[in-house]
């Protein structure tokens, strides 16, 4: 189980990403469309003025059951240990153990 403070920090980051997503997207579109270097610099400063934790790449993909940050399968949102355990218990519909 991950530390509660780390899980809370990640939840806070997800909220910030959602809050600033539209503003960040519009600024990035302006930045990519701008041709003048001074205009690009000004837009870049506006992007830098946004909270650092509002960038989507700062959000860590975590297991929703344990909060572990590593070995997380995107399709399920579970870490490998929980995925194996729940698949064996039949709690994941459509997941079967492979054999050939």
From Swiss-Prot:
Any GO BP annotation: translation
One Pfam family it belongs to: Ribosomal_S14
Keyword RNA-binding: yes
InterPro entries the record matches: Ribosomal_uS14 (IPR001209), Ribosomal_uS14_bac/plastid (IPR023036), Ribosomal_uS14_CS (IPR018271)
Gene Ontology molecular function: any one: rRNA binding
Keywords: Ribonucleoprotein, Ribosomal protein, RNA-binding, rRNA-binding
Matching Gene3D superfamilies: 1.10.287.1480
One GO cellular component term: small ribosomal subunit
PROSITE patterns in the record: RIBOSOMAL_S14
Subunit structure of this chain's protein: Part of the 30S ribosomal subunit. Contacts proteins S3 and S10.
Function (record text): Binds 16S rRNA, required for the assembly of 30S particles and may also be responsible for determining the conformation of the 16S rRNA at the A site.
HAMAP family listed in its UniProt record: Ribosomal_uS14_1
Family in the record: Belongs to the universal ribosomal protein uS14 family.
Name of the molecule in the record: Small ribosomal subunit protein uS14
Organism: Prochlorococcus marinus (strain MIT 9312)
Phylogenetic placement of the source organism: Bacteria, Bacillati, Cyanobacteriota, Cyanophyceae, Synechococcales
């Amino acid at each position: 189980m991950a530390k509660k403070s780390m899980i809370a920090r990640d939840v806070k980051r997800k909220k910030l990403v959602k809050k600033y997503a539209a503003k960040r997207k519009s600024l990035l579109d302006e930045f990519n469309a701008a041709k003048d270097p001074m205009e690009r610099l000004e837009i870049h400063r506006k992007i830098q003025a946004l909270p650092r934790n509002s960038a989507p790449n700062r959000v860590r993909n975590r297991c929703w059951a344990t909060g572990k940050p590593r070995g997380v399968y995107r399709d399920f949102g579970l870490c490998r240990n929980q995925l194996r355990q729940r698949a064996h218990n039949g709690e994941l519909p459509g997941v079967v153990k492979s054999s050939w």
